């Protein structure tokens, strides 16, 4: 008990004043129970403050920068956690699972960004879910991204690791096949797939018939641009843009067309295949404003 009291006073100088005001340290206490009660209340105050400060810090993302050993020593690893604690066991699991998915293709990758988050359950409405998002920055093949939700954080890490491994293997196989058939290759004789030309009416029809996103109750939702990103946009062929769209696992992809130099938008059609939006004669056509009902949806952005 004496050791605990000394430690508590050393950690929180305010406790010294509190004890001094209520206890005469130079004299023997006449009421032992009163002394014990005063000391307990003072120490409890200090402990409550410490716990509160830890809870506040957990609301901020924990960012850890690491690197693997051995063949992966050249690959930078960034691990972030939001609304959860990144324990040593979780960090070791990420290093093991994500590391194994990247190990055989480490020459293609320069940086791995892993983001772990929690929602639902005690944190918010809805079922308890754990999300793992992995973004790979490759040396010559753009960005590869995958994300998965699961009840267990470890399960979400395992699922994403498998997806990343498949995507890297696909890139490696393509590079190998490309090198194997490069002899006698003439790029000018290779035609990119002809894009499907769509009309304005077709675009509006797809937008209006698209399923509405799941809405949530959020009175504090602000309908404005809350984040802006800047990207390098090197010229790509349509085939290369399709590959990038699959790698980032998004529904659309904006790119600079290698042939025309214009910004095009490639997107997945709900009937299957891809659609391509191209400026008409190098100039965008201004569309009339249409009343669109805004559905509030959850955001997992930073």
UniProtKB/Swiss-Prot annotation:
InterPro entries: HPF/YfiA_ribosome-assoc, HPF_long/plastid, RHF-like, RHF/RaiA, Ribosom_S30AE_C, Ribosom_S30AE_C_sf
GO biological process, alphabetically ordered: negative regulation of translational elongation
The organism's place on the tree of life at top rank: Eukaryota
Keyword rRNA-binding: yes
One cellular-component annotation, GO: cytosolic small ribosomal subunit
CDD domains in UniProt: RaiA
Pfam families, A to Z: Ribosom_S30AE_C, Ribosomal_S30AE
Single GO molecular function: rRNA binding
UniProt-listed HAMAP family: HPF
Functional summary from the UniProt entry: Ribosome-binding factor involved in light- and temperature-dependent control of protein synthesis. Interacts with 16S sRNA nucleotides at the A-site and P-site, where it protects the decoding center and inhibits translation by preventing tRNA binding. Stabilizes 70S ribosomes against dissociation. May be recycled by the combined action of ribosome-recycling factor (RRF) and EF-G.
Protein known as: Ribosome-binding factor PSRP1, chloroplastic
